[in-house]
From Swiss-Prot:
Residues 184-219, 304-339 form the EF-hand domain. GTP 2 binds at residues 428, 430-433, 528, 530, 559. Its EC number is 3.6.5.-. It is an enzyme of class 3 (hydrolase). SUPFAM superfamilies: EF-hand, P-loop containing nucleoside triphosphate hydrolases. The gene is RHOT2. This is Mitochondrial Rho GTPase 2. Mg(2+) 1 binds at residues 18, 35, 57. The chain crosses the membrane at residues 592-614.
Length: 618
């Protein structure tokens, strides 16, 4: 909505333009009228719409043609004033003033016009009969107001309608020639209907209508008022009411009726509540609310975000099979301008046996978006109507910003639930297969239905009895690490082909260049263990290299099996990411059991000492 309104008064000499302005300001008819009034600003707090309003007079005798064109260009709305007692001033509306204001403008860019019939105190009847053909000819005319500067009749109403024409314009909503909603308005209202239809049955029930009414206007409708609304729709449409609820056609008809009856501010209130601007586009303030992400922190969905998304999943799972089919997913995204997820989705998250998107996979995908691209996540939650449907100020309340990673390392603990693992290795080392194995897919299953490749996979892993999300990001062997942030992650997985004598040297080089002096835990993985092992190029063996650099020995891995691949390596990666402050070697099995044995020995020693003290006291 515009932050201020600029009203320009035009018309023939002596029609009373200046008198109208002075009558509004002085609240009395001026005895002496100057040729032209100075520009007047009405403060926001004294206007009905709480918007500052500038009123500009025009005098043909004092201003040039160029000055007039400048004022027209600055105006938000033009009031063309005529004398109800002089038909010549009415004729000039058609032949002079409207062509001057909007002659070269296209329909969508025309300035709204209010026709003002002044000096109604001098005429018994009305000029509306003569004015109506002009209003029908020019669609930019919002309304016509008959008034009297002398009697102060309809003066404030005149400027209210002028304000309204700017703040709640008809032109973007309604085509008066076709007598129907414009396509952009119809699309916006259809989206609003679909968001408000919380059980996805294509009907707004009384409860849904009242929730909608309260959300937009602050109060629910009284039961009788609700029945009256449905009765009006039922009488005027063939399919507007169904099962005692409002259909989409009924909802669109109701808004058309508001506009036709001059109550387009009602439709604008609805549109603006759902984030639309004057061009019927969702505003940046709505889609991208202010959100600060400090360096070293990450973003995760919180319980509010997950609850909201789970409700929407269940709403669109029409057959209640616990998965979204392609058609159901398309319906889910019908409130978006375009489909935000491509076919690579099915190689990014877990799917059902039939290849459909499960609830688990659905929530994993949203977790991935929230972590990798928080701006896009906010945008998507905005399209889904999160602030309105969750009764929150903005979609930022569906997200949590984690503590800075540096502090986690200092304190030796973290509250984070999502971790990023970069998977690095030479071409052909098995990185893509490793990512797909994380989704439970063996090499045979991957070959049967390859699908669209994805550089990411995400799944959940249990770490010390807690569920964590682990994101695997496959880094191409051709990737150039130009800055430290390119290698940044929570854990690095360096994968090499056990059967390729040159494969390990690539991983060793990457480790020494980018990870050796960092605090990022690293895990080496020897892939394709089902193939004969090849001797690596001269130098340290993989096991010796890991020992030298205080790393756990390479983990042996193969996804060439009949059943789903093993998950131990992914648990190991998630554990390393969760506890980066521990020495990586401590993640090895031998070290773990050594610590268990030491702990048991210490416990036994304390117990024995305590026994001796107690025995002595006896």
């Amino acid at each position: 909505m515009k932050r201020d309104v600029r009203i320009l008064l035009l018309g023939e000499a002596q029609v009373g333009k200046t008198s109208l302005i002075m009558a509004l300001v002085g609240e009395e008819f001026p005895e002496e009228v100057p040729p032209r009034a100075e520009e007047i600003t009405i403060p926001a707090d004294v206007t009905p719409e709480k918007v500052p309003t500038h009123i500009v007079d025009y005098s043909e005798s004092e201003q040039t043609e160029d000055e007039l064109q400048e004022e027209i260009a600055k105006a938000n709305v033009v009031c063309v004033v005529y004398d109800v007692t002089k038909e010549a001033t009415i004729e000039k509306i058609r032949t002079k003033w409207i062509p001057m204001v909007n002659g070269g403008a296209e329909k969508g860019a025309r300035i709204p016009i209010i026709l003002v019939g002044n000096k109604s105190d001098l005429q018994m009847g009305s000029s509306m009969e003569v004015i109506l053909p002009i209003m029908n000819q020019f669609s930019e005319i919002e309304t016509c107001v008959e008034c009297s500067a002398k009697n102060l009749k309809n003066i404030s109403e005149l400027f209210y309608y002028a304000q309204k024409a700017v703040l709640h314009p008809t032109a973007p909503l309604y085509d008066p020639e076709e007598k129907q909603l414009r396509p952009a308005c119809s699309r916006a209202l259809t989206r609003i209907f679909n968001l408000s239809d919380q059980d996805n049955n294509q009907i707004l029930s009384d409860d849904e209508l009242n929730y909608f009414q309260k959300s937009c206007f602050g109060n629910p409708l009284a039961p009788q008022a609700l029945e009256d609304v449905k009765m009006v729709v039922w009488k005027n449409t063939t399919d507007g009411v169904q099962d005692n609820g409002l259909t989409l056609n009924g909802f669109l008809f109701l808004n058309t009726l508001f506009i036709q009856r001059g109550r387009h501010e009602t439709t604008w209130t609805i549109l603006r509540r759902f984030g639309y601007d004057d061009e019927l586009e969702l505003t940046d303030d709505y889609l991208y609310p202010q959100f600060r992400l400090p360096p070293g922190c990450s973003t995760e969905l919180n319980h509010l975000g997950y609850q909201f998304l789970q409700r929407l999943f269940e709403k669109h799972d029409k057959d209640q099979d616990g998965a979204l089919s392609p058609a159901e997913l398309q319906n889910f995204f019908s409130v978006f301008p375009c489909m935000p997820w491509g076919p690579e989705l099915y190689n990014t998250v877990c799917t059902t046996d039939k290849g459909l998107l499960s609830l688990h996979g659905f929530l994993c995908q949203w977790t991935l978006i929230a972590y990798l691209d928080v701006r896009h996540c906010l945008e998507c939650l905005g399209y889904l109507g999160y602030p309105i449907l969750s009764e929150q100020d903005s979609q930022t309340q569906a997200l949590t910003v984690t503590r800075e990673k540096r502090i986690d390392l200092e304190k030796g603990q973290t509250q984070r639930n999502v971790f990023l693992c970069k998977v690095l290795g030479a071409r052909g080392a098995g990185k893509s297969a490793f990512l797909q194995a994380f989704l439970g897919r063996s090499l045979a299953a991957q070959r049967e239905s390859p699908g669209e490749p994805s550089p990411y996979t995400i799944n959940t892993v249990q770490v010390n009895g807690q569920e964590k999300y682990l994101i695997l990001h496959e880094v191409s062997a051709e990737t150039q690490f130009t800055k430290p942030s390119d290698a940044a992650c929570d854990v690095a997985c360096l994968i090499y082909d056990l059967s390729d004598p040159k494969s390990f040297s690539y991983c060793a080089s990457i480790y020494k260049q980018h990870y050796m002096d960092s605090q990022i835990p690293c895990v080496f993985v020897a892939s394709k263990t089902d193939l004969p092992e090849a001797s690596q190029q001269p130098g340290l063996s993989p096991a010796e290299f890991c020992y030298k650099h205080c790393l756990p020995p390479p983990f042996l891995f193969s996804c060439h099996s009949q059943g789903p691949p093993g998950t131990a390596i992914y648990t190991k990666l998630a554990t390393a990411a969760t506890f980066p402050h521990l020495n990586a070697v401590e993640l090895g099995a031998a070290s773990f059991w050594l610590r268990v044995a030491l702990g048991a020995a210490v416990t036994a020693l304390v117990g024995f000492t305590l026994y001796r003290v107690l025995a002595k006291n006896k």
